[in-house]
Amino acid sequence: MRSNNNNPLTRDEILSRYFPQYRPAVAASQGLSGGSCIIAHDTHRIVLRRHHDPDAPPAHFLRHHRALSQLPASLAPRALFYTPGWMAVEYLHGVVNSALPDADELAALLYHLHQQPRFGWRIALSPLLAQYWSCCDPARRTPFWLRRLKQLQKNGEPRPLRLAPLHMDVHGDNIVLTSAGLRLIDWEYAGDGDIALELAAVWVEDERQHRQLADAYAARARIDARQLWRQIRLWHPWVIMLKAGWFEYRWRQTGEQQFIRLADETWRQLRMKG
């Protein structure tokens, strides 16, 4: 279902106009991006997502809806409704753990995603990193950040190993263990890109866990494991800068202390690695 109304509505207006029998249940806690709530009617639940990023164009939110509309139920919740500023998606019943699944299970899930038809829009990190720099708190801009940004822009993004649809925010809170298997939620950063970029961006605990995931994926995708790992390492500086910039971006938008703590920790990691 899609509305033709071009003016963003409040949550209460959305409920009264399109979901009159539903009431807010609990806020969605998965992920860091916010902007979600769960609405319920008797035992039936729906996730209502708001376009929460004032600096992102409406087209980005529409892409999120299109990605969910295109993906199979074996990967993601179904898109149920869209109107400018809001969408409703299927609520997935299951267990959410902060820890990632084991390497084989996660590799199978990501490989299944990467076998799907492409979304139709490319993920471009260079302009995104530049946006984070320009939109962050000016007091947080450092010569170190600018040097790293310019070096990445000079080098250019790695040539893709394989192009596929990517999720780009894979961590434990965005994976639901349903009765039918693992599913991914929170697809707002989805787009087409290198499979090694996806693997580089997974929120792993350490390099050992990262290598296990890469090896499991290589075996499933029939890719040389050493070649895949080299490609992942090429993307690594981009991913670390992406995370640091995103934390800074969200800090400027929200003022929430969790983001500044995460940004500081990510900058420390970058400085330690030179």
Curated annotation (Swiss-Prot):
Gene Ontology molecular function: any one: ATP binding
InterPro entries: Aminoglycoside_PTrfase, Kinase-like_dom_sf, Thiamine_kinase
Highest taxon, organism lineage: Bacteria
Pathway where this protein functions: Cofactor biosynthesis; thiamine diphosphate biosynthesis; thiamine phosphate from thiamine: step 1/1
Keyword Lipid metabolism: no
Catalytic activity: thiamine + ATP = thiamine phosphate + ADP + H(+)
Documented EC number(s): 2.7.1.89
GO biological process: thiamine diphosphate biosynthetic process; thiamine metabolic process
Family: Belongs to the thiamine kinase family.
Free-text function comment from the UniProt entry: Catalyzes the ATP-dependent phosphorylation of thiamine to thiamine phosphate. Is involved in thiamine salvage.
Protein name per Swiss-Prot or TrEMBL: Thiamine kinase
Organism: Salmonella agona (strain SL483)
Lineage, highest ranks first: Bacteria, Pseudomonadati, Pseudomonadota, Gammaproteobacteria, Enterobacterales
